[in-house]
Amino acid sequence: MKLFIAEKPSVAQAIADVLGGGKKANGFIDLPNLSTKITWCYGHLLEQEQPEYYVDGGKVLAEHLPVIPDRFKLSPREKAAAQVKVIKDLLKEADEVVNAGDADREGQLLVDELFPVLAWKGKTSRIWLSSLDEESVRLALLKVKPNDQ
């Protein structure tokens, strides 16, 4: 199954419309005839853990500052936990993921930051959408590139 992860629901819907509509489900759009599902983010779904997470005992004191861990831990934002679970479950079914974040660095990061947290290591591609009109989406879908380009 091919899974598109869009930056927001309106982008997911624009992609689905060009691909034939699909059926809305809880947190994604299913296009079974194409073996494709489209899900979305709502801005950044993850956030860095608070400083207390990194300090033994969980209480930050002056002597702990600044708190700079070797690696920052990202966790789902409270309001985004349900959508993160939807994406995690869909990734388990996916053979390929298409990053459909906005055509800028932030759009790239917004989707890419999910992959290590949700343990996705499979094939990942990227489309660049400059507009959501039908012709722009159709052209973007014809120009799928590797995610690292």
Regions found by a protein language model. Name each.
Residues 1-149:
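Intrinsically disordered, low-complexity regulatory segments
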